[in-house]
Regions:
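Acidic, PIN/NYN-like endoribonuclease modules and their adjacent C-terminal/linker elements
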Residues: 2, 107-143
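Generic structural signal for small/hydrophobic residues in well-ordered secondary structure
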Residues: 8-9, 44, 81, 110
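Short, well-ordered alpha-helical scaffold segment located
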Residues: 11, 40-43, 123
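Short, contiguous strand/loop micro-motifs
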Residues: 12, 44, 92-94
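Short linear capping/connector segments at secondary-structure termini
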Residues: 41, 61-65
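Active-site neighborhoods of divalent-metal-dependent phosphate/nucleic-acid chemistry enzymes
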Residues: 69-123
Length: 143
């Protein structure tokens, strides 16, 4: 069975602005192997530069919902995320919740779906180590 990918915001921004990672994003999307996190969608909406970009995003989000490929945080993800943030703070010595809570929700979305999280942010590997200590597995591809 082929992997399903959940691209984080960094990948979509590089794809939209600079056409980076286009082969992976296009091929995965065309073959129906992409899950969109509602948290990633929120960040993309926040960064939309034009009405045209917003409309394109509207169509993408709706199409992902239609094929049940739109992942929203589950009720228990908020508490799980808090525990992970506490562990991350202990691991790193300090962390600001505002800097990481969205990452945690995206990560948990990938874990919940069994998807490979694709990111251009190498720091995401730290979360994989923390999840491993909790008995969970983050499948991660850093570009």
């Amino acid at each position: 069975m082929a992997d399903v990918f959940l691209f984080d915001t960094s990948v979509y921004i590089a794809y939209i602005r600079r056409k980076e990672h286009s082969e992976l994003v296009d091929r995965s999307t065309e073959s129906g192997r992409v899950v969109l996190s509602s948290v990633v969608a929120m960040e993309l909406y926040a960064g939309a530069r034009s009405v045209a970009e917003k409309r394109l995003l509207d169509r993408f989000v709706e199409s992902m919902k239609m094929v049940s490929a739109y992942e929203t945080p589950r009720e228990d993800d908020w508490a799980r995320g808090g525990v992970l943030l506490e562990r991350f703070t202990r691991f790193r010595g300090h962390a600001l919740v505002r800097d990481h809570f969205r990452d945690v929700l995206v990560i948990l979305g990938a874990v919940n779906r069994g998807a490979v999280l694709v990111s251009s942010d190498a720091h995401m590997a730290n979360w994989g180590n923390i999840l491993k200590r909790q008995g969970e597995t983050l499948r991660l591809k850093v570009l």
